[in-house]
Regions:
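Short S/T/G/P-rich N-terminal loop/turn motif that feeds into the first structured element of a domain
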Residues: 1-118, 126-142
């Protein structure tokens, strides 16, 4: 039965470019996925790569102890925060935010990066050099 169904599935030609799988572990600061905001139309998946495991550990600490709170304060609506256990771009962490649209996203990020609490936390010595590369993937609601 599986083989028969598989032939129907692949008969339509190219279905996708590639498949990539990952295993993620939730941060202590947000242990469960949250529902998107009601008017969500844009999702931003962010992958923060670290130069080594210690850099990622320190960035996760920053999120758990300070940054997630500030995200909520300025209205950066999260879906999840996680450490990548298995997958590409290791060592890394992955999180997803959601917005009404690109304008809402840009306004909210601007509020965040100009917030006095962000300026203080991002200048702390323990959080220096925690991210070596940021990958952003934008997804639209269909």
């Amino acid at each position: 039965d599986f083989i028969e169904k598989m032939s129907e599935y692949t008969a339509s030609g190219k279905i996708y470019n590639r498949i990539s799988s990952s295993l993620l572990r939730a941060f202590d600061g947000l242990k469960q996925m949250l529902d998107p905001i009601k008017e969500a139309g844009l999702f931003e998946l962010r992958i923060y790569e670290g130069q080594n495991e210690d850099a990622v550990r320190r960035k996760i600490k920053m999120f758990n102890e300070e940054e997630i709170t500030l995200f909520n304060k300025v209205g950066l609506p999260p879906i999840f925060f996680s450490k990548m256990i298995v997958g590409p771009y290791q060592p890394s962490l992955v999180y997803m935010l959601n917005f009404r649209d690109l304008e809402h996203r840009n306004e909210t990020w601007n509020t965040f990066i100009n917030h006095p609490e962000w300026k203080v936390m991002s200048s702390k010595e323990e959080y220096k050099n925690t991210v070596s590369n940021i990958r952003k993937i934008f997804l639209e609601k269909v």
